[in-house]
């Protein structure tokens, strides 16, 4: 029993964050091994994912009927992680889906504060969190983008960060057709 209420609350929050972090990681690793590849329409998956958010600030430009072979639930999880981050830090979000040569390109732009360019690669490291000033009130365990990157790479793809035309962050996901 801890008498200091502030210390007790902080410890409780830290324990909750650790539990969330472990659950996210366990869920990711178990689905990696159990889910089978299937052919699915990624434009439909993105459309359905966006619709679940019921957010009028998300706009989209998707080419229809783009099929890929992969683990659909993992791809959806990666999309959710990116969109969740955008919603946390931005007001306006644009999602795009295009094809170029043998690649599917998913682009997520937002008008949030963005991430300093020198941090672009760091945010994909497990448990890495940007400094507290970026989002002190935002709950994060530092696994979302790490898991997202692992999912994309496990499908033979790549994920990069850039400055968005909306002045926030642009996340570009490349997946093989």
Each language-model region and where it sits:
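Acidic ATP/Mg2+-coordinating residue in the GHKL
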Residues: 110
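Short beta-strand/loop element within the Bergerat-fold HATPase_c
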Residues: 92-102
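Short alpha-helical Gxxx[C/S/T] motif in the catalytic ATP-binding
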Residues: 144, 148
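Conserved glycine-rich
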Residues: 156-157
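Conserved catalytic submotifs in the C-terminal HATPase_c
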Residues: 59-70, 100-101
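Conserved micro-motifs of the catalytic ATP-binding
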Residues: 31-35, 67-70
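Short conserved segment of the HATPase_c
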Residues: 115-128
């Amino acid at each position: 029993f801890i008498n200091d209420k502030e210390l007790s609350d902080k410890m409780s929050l830290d324990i909750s964050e650790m539990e969330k972090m472990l659950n996210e990681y366990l869920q990711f690793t178990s689905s990696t091994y159990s889910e089978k590849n299937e052919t699915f329409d990624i434009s439909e998956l993105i459309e359905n994912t966006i619709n679940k958010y019921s957010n009028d600030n998300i706009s989209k430009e998707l080419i229809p009927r783009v099929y890929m072979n992969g683990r659909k639930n993992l791809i959806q999880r990666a999309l959710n992680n990116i969109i969740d981050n955008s919603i946390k830090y931005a007001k306006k979000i644009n999602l795009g889906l295009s094809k170029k040569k043998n690649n599917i390109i998913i682009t997520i732009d937002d008008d949030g504060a963005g991430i300093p360019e020198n941090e672009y690669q760091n945010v994909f490291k497990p448990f890495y969190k940007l400094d507290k000033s970026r989002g002190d009130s935002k709950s994060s365990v530092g696994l979302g983008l790490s898991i997202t990157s692992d999912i994309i790479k496990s499908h033979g793809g790549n994920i990069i960060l850039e400055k968005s035309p909306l002045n926030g962050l642009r996340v570009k996901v490349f997946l093989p057709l």
